[in-house]
């Protein structure tokens, strides 16, 4: 029987990620969430990229230059009696693979929508990934300090496009220059908005009760409009149902403005009250419960060079069960070795601290000297592998060339490390000495060349290559696989993990090969 202190620690944890379309305000909301968690005294303004005042969660050099979040940061802070782990994900559309993998390490998600634009395509893609595990979703309709679309239309769009029921928790009163605040439906109170309070926590100005005459004094004719609107909203929308939320079937909807620092506390209250505590995890042999005494965890991301002064890499691990203690012995299942871990890290977006202990739901960082890969499982001796950390087939390809041919060794080392980290995928064709780089979006190519130069002192350039797509190939029959390998060697390559991959010049070529070799499986995704 697990002891009560251990259970209390698990029950306190809330681990979530923010998902949104680029520019819906995700980085701003991350800042404000941290401000409420007292993790930041003054939220970093995201606008001021050139003024040297960078957002706290965008800390890699390239992100600071560009003003976009490229890699996942992890931030832990206390709020309302809970301990919240926020995983910030790349907002830029070219970094979707890293984002997808991060979603495997959380128990719930906050979806941020630009209320002027509604549901956008990146949000649709990310929601598809959360659907793989029926992750509970909290929704924040952002940018109420601008003119927005009709709130009922916005909720209809979420329901129809994303196929999830909406239950409004707060309701906006006006928008843009006329934004007055929100009505909290469950608490029956109006919270009034003050502009110009973006960097400090606003003093809460609350009027209790929708029929309170003080409301008419405070917001004039908007009070009568609100009462009429609420009659309509109550009749037309869903009530919040906690069980449906936990199944990923219904999302509570909050309205506010992250830039104006308004409504963010409502979201955090909702996450602490309703979002699931650390959930059980599937492995290839059994389901692992968080309150099991023995430690287990899996690696969902590898980040190179978090400390520019040191050429190090850190593996981000989600703790799934048991308790991490400094100096403990862990079993690295893939390579079958025991390791002593005395220097795991906790994070506050690039500021590291040594972790004394960690519990299920927490994210810790392990120093990685090249032995840890994405998807690796760590236990206290038991042999199993956590499942559900996917690799996605790249959609774009380039051949990479050196300006200085003598640096081939450094180039390969850099590319292999970057591929293990998940920044890019590397393919080595069986029949040539080419190196092919595959990515989900163009910006990843730029990032790789930039990092090869700054971290490995290698100047590389890209050339176009006629590759349309890649598929990992498997076959239960060794003989048939060997025959396929012999006959199709000009289209085969090994990826960074030495997995056999089919490199298709066109979709027509891929379809023909699939017809010709029905016993070979051509896979779009691969478990790490």
Curated annotation (Swiss-Prot):
Outline the extent of the tr-type G domain. 11-279
Q: What organism does this protein naturally occur in?
A: Shewanella sp. (strain W3-18-1)
Gene this chain is encoded by: prfC
Query: Carries keyword GTP-binding?
Result: yes
Q: Which GO terms describe its molecular function?
A: GTP binding; GTPase activity; guanosine tetraphosphate binding; translation release factor activity, codon nonspecific; translation release factor activity, codon specific
User: What's the name of the protein?
Assistant: Peptide chain release factor 3
Keywords assigned by UniProt?
Cytoplasm, GTP-binding, Nucleotide-binding, Protein biosynthesis
Q: Its function?
A: Increases the formation of ribosomal termination complexes and stimulates activities of RF-1 and RF-2. It binds guanine nucleotides and has strong preference for UGA stop codons. It may interact directly with the ribosome. The stimulation of RF-1 and RF-2 is significantly reduced by GTP and GDP, but not by GMP.
Gene Ontology terms: cellular component: cytosol
């Amino acid at each position: 029987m697990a002891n009560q202190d251990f259970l209390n620690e698990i029950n306190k944890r809330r681990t979530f990620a923010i998902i949104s379309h680029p520019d819906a305000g995700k980085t701003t909301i991350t800042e404000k969430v941290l401000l409420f968690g007292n993790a930041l005294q003054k939220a970093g303004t995201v606008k001021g990229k050139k003024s040297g005042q960078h957002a706290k969660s965008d800390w890699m050099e390239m992100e600071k230059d560009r003003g976009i979040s490229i890699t996942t940061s992890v931030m832990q802070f206390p709020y309302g009696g809970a301990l919240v782990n926020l995983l910030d994900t790349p907002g830029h559309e070219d970094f979707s693979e890293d984002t997808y993998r991060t979603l495997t390490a959380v128990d719930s998600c906050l979806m941020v929508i630009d209320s002027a634009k509604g549901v956008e395509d990146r949000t649709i893609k990310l929601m598809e990934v959360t659907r793989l595990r029926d992750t509970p979703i909290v929704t924040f309709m952002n940018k109420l300090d601008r003119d927005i679309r009709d709130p009922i239309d916005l909720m209809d769009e979420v329901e129809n496009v994303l196929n999830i029921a909406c239950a409004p928790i707060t309701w906006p009163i006006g928008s843009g220059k006329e934004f007055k605040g929100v009505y909290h439906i469950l608490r029956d109170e109006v919270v009034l908005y003050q502009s110009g309070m973006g960097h400090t926590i606003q003093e809460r100005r609350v009027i209790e009760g929708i029929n309170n005459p003080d409301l008419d004094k405070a917001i004039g004719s908007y009070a009568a409009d609100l009462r009429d609107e609420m009659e309509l909203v109550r009749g037309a929308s869903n009530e919040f149902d906690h069980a449906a939320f936990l199944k990923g079937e219904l999302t509570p909807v909050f309205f506010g403005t992250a830039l104006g620092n308004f409504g963010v506390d409502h979201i955090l209250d909702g996450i602490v009250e309703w979002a699931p505590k650390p959930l059980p995890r599937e492995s290839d042999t059994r389901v692992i419960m968080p309150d099991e005494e023995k430690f287990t965890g899996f690696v969902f991301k590898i980040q190179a060079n978090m400390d520019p002064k040191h050429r190090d890499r850190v593996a981000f691990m989600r703790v799934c069960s048991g308790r991490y203690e400094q100096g403990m012995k862990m079993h690295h299942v893939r390579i079958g070795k025991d390791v002593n871990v005395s220097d795991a890290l906790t994070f506050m977006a690039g500021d590291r601290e040594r972790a004394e202990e960690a519990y299920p739901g927490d994210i810790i960082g392990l120093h990685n000297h090249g032995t840890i890969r994405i998807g690796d499982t760590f236990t206290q001796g038991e042999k199993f592998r956590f499942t559900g950390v996917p690799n996605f087939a790249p959609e774009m390809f380039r051949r990479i060339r050196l300006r200085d041919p003598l640096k081939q060794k450094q180039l390969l080392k850099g590319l292999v490390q970057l591929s293990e980290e998940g920044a890019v995928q590397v393919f080595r064709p069986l029949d040539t000495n080419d190196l092919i780089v595959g990515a989900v979006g163009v910006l990843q190519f730029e990032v790789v060349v930039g990092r090869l130069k700054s971290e490995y002192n290698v100047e590389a350039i890209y050339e176009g290559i006629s590759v349309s797509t890649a598929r990992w190939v498997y076959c239960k029959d060794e003989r048939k696989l060997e025959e396929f390998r012999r006959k199709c060697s000009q289209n085969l390559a090994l990826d960074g993990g030495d997995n056999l991959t089919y490199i298709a010049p066109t979709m027509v070529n891929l379809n023909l090969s699939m017809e010709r070799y029905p016993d070979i499986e051509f896979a779009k995704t691969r478990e790490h």
